[in-house]
Amino acid sequence: MTHQTHAYHMVNPSPWPLTGALSALLMTSGLVMWFHYNSTLLLTLGLTTNLLTMYQWWRDIIRESTFQGHHTPAVQKGLRYGMILFIISEVFFFSGFFWAFYHSSLAPTPELGGCWPPTGIHPLNPMEVPLLNTSVLLASGVSITWAHHSLMEGNRKHMLQALFITISLGIYFTLLQASEYYEAPFTISDGVYGSTFFVATGFHGLHVIIGSTFLIVCFLRQLKFHFTSNHHFGFEAAAWYWHFVDVVWLFLYVSIYWWGS
C-alpha cells in the first residue's frame, strides 16, 4: 500500500454495490412474479444474491475497519453523516405511506362508502396483538440503550446480554406480525385500506428484519472482541437504525391501528 498523508479511506473498487443492485432488481421483480403468477423462482434468486452480497460486503467493511484501521475519526465522521442522511431518506420514504393513508382516510370517496374503515372491512383490534407489538418494540429500545451504555462503560458481558435481548425481541415482533398477517380478515387486495395497511406495516416489518440482521452481525462481532468503548460505529449505526424503526412503529400504531380503526 502506498504511503498517504491524509486521514481519509481510499476505497478499493468493489463489486458489491452492483450485485446488491441486481439482487434488489431480482427481489422486486420476484415479488411481482410471486403476487401475479405464484412463482417464487426470481424472489428466491434475489434473496440468495442479496444474502451473499450482504455477507461479503460486511466482511470487507469489517476487514477495512477493524483489521486494517482505515476507519480513522475523519472517516467515522463521514460515515455518521452518511447514516444520518440515510435515516432522513427513510423518514421521507415512510412519509409517503402515511400521506397515502391519510389522503384516503380523511376524505373517503363514495366508492369506500364515504366512511373509514371502508364498508365491509373489519379492522384489527388495536388493543390486542398491535399493543403487544408496541410494548415489545419499546422494550427493545430500552435494551439497545442498555447495550450502548454497557459498551461505553466497557462491560462486555452486559453488552452481550442486552444485545441478545434486543435481537430476541426483534424476532418475536416479526413472528407476532407474521401471525397477525396470517389471521387478518382482509388482504392487500381489499381496496385502498388493504393496500395502505399491508404496504406500510409490511415495509416496517422489513425494516425490523434488516435491523435485527444488523444487530446479529454486531452481536457476532462483539463475541470476537471487535468493539471498544471509543471505536464502535458499526454498533452505533445499528442502534440509531433500531431507534428509528421504533419511532416509525409508534406512528404506525397511532395512525393505522388506533385512529384508523
Swiss-Prot record:
The keyword Nucleotide-binding does not apply. The keyword Mitochondrion applies. InterPro entries: Cyt_c/ubiquinol_Oxase_su3 (IPR024791), Cyt_c_oxase_su3_dom (IPR033945), Cyt_c_oxidase-like_su3 (IPR000298), Cyt_c_oxidase_su3-like_sf (IPR035973), Cyt_c_oxidase_su3_a-hlx (IPR013833). SUPFAM superfamilies: Cytochrome c oxidase subunit III-like. It is a multi-pass membrane protein. It catalyses: 4 Fe(II)-[cytochrome c] + O2 + 8 H(+)(in) = 4 Fe(III)-[cytochrome c] + 2 H2O + 4 H(+)(out). It is an enzyme of class 7 (translocase). PANTHER family: CYTOCHROME C OXIDASE SUBUNIT 3, CYTOCHROME C OXIDASE SUBUNIT III. Belongs to the cytochrome c oxidase subunit 3 family. This is Cytochrome c oxidase subunit 3. It comes from Rhinoceros unicornis (Greater Indian rhinoceros). The gene is MT-CO3.
